[in-house]
Amino acid sequence: MSTMTPAEIVSELDKHIIGQAKAKKAVAVALRNRWRRQQVAEPLRQEITPKNILMIGPTGVGKTEIARRLAKLADAPFIKIEATKFTEVGYVGRDVDSIVRDLIEISVKQTREAEMRKVRSKATDQAEDRILDILLPQPRAVGFGGNAEHANDDNNATRQTFRKRLREGQLDDKEVELDLEQPSVGMDIMAPPGMEEMTEQIRSMFSNLGSGKKQRRKVKIKEALKLLTDEEAAKMLNEEEVKTKAVQNVEQNGIVFLDEIDKITSRNNEGSGGEVSRQGVQRDLLPLVEGTTVNTKYGMVKTDHILFIASGAFHLAKPSDLIPELQGRFPIRVELDSLSVEDFEAILDATDASLVKQYQALLATEDVQLEFAADGIRRLAEIAFAVNEKTENIGARRLYTVIEKLLEEVSFSAGNHAGERVTIDAKYVDRALGEVAQDEDLSRYVL
């Protein structure tokens, strides 16, 4: 679990996301409250439930990006899912309980990796011993007394020399033959609605059929060391302990990001067919958000303390169109602002992995030096903003389209301009995009 303070979390998010201070503060406080709750003594700790968040804002302003970056900072089981993927029980589609099943799979993977890191050093030593046993088979005991001891000392000295060479990478390209455990073979089985649990058990049964068998492979020592280290580390793990920790981690620290929640709202001007299904999904989500117990292959998982963050553009619907019970389960509401020209400028140039830096790095691979003048970045931002105003407002995603169109010619003929410098200023932008940006019909289809 992350131990970062809210200010530190916001500072990290600022490196990648421009503006949206209210949303950043809300998710930062929610994440910090997970840690605070762990410091509270029982039985009060059980009574403290997470305050779920509803993020409201147009598309392309940073809702999904906040969730994506939060996942990296959280150091906790995290899943982002589209609410539109789910249907009411009885309809064709995914059951909402599969959210928790997917989350527990992520947690098991995280926990197993964390436990393997703890034993990695010991596992590496054992893997080195196995490789050295192949390279330097133990000599047969011949002779008596001193001769045997002398041979043993020589073998140990040679072994240490080879171990040193192995660690320095001098033997990486040498090939060895190994007997490795065969990985379990996964199977894809189409699951009928509501029968995901049974399907998972069948898949697990088939995957265990080939496990435990050895397979002889010829690999380079560098790869052999990695394969054997993983195998030795896996032997040291207590799988039951991993499962128990994973379930506990989901229950105490799990985060679910529900995207496109506005698409499952009920709207009065529509027919009753879709209405039933959408309301049904909301009612199925309700116990999950409220707190229920879901049966998974790793055991029963309680959702009482899982944090839910929902987001939606709410263009055609309002948050009040959600069923009242579900509205009440998202007490913290945050509105995200539409992006201004200044925001577009900052997105292009001010973030750690800005679009400008990405394209400069891409073209540098062909020895083309791409430079963006301040007035060029400003003009790009103005064009992206204007096109959003005239046509559909897709937020920051418009920048991808605009900059791709701008650099189309340079990217195509980069091989012919090796060693050259290309400067993108306002004149260059107007020459490449001016006509398209001004013609509304053209910009609707091209930008």
Swiss-Prot record:
CDD domains cross-referenced by the UniProt entry: RecA-like_HslU
Quaternary context: A double ring-shaped homohexamer of HslV is capped on each side by a ring-shaped HslU homohexamer. The assembly of the HslU/HslV complex is dependent on binding of ATP.
Lineage, opening ranks: Bacteria, Pseudomonadati, Pseudomonadota, Betaproteobacteria, Burkholderiales
Localization in the cell: Cytoplasm
UniProt name for this protein: ATP-dependent protease ATPase subunit HslU
Native organism: Burkholderia cenocepacia (strain HI2424)
UniProt xrefs under NCBIfam families: hslU, PRK05201.1
Gene: hslU
GO cellular component, one term: HslUV protease complex
Function: ATPase subunit of a proteasome-like degradation complex; this subunit has chaperone activity. The binding of ATP and its subsequent hydrolysis by HslU are essential for unfolding of protein substrates subsequently hydrolyzed by HslV. HslU recognizes the N-terminal part of its protein substrates and unfolds these before they are guided to HslV for hydrolysis.
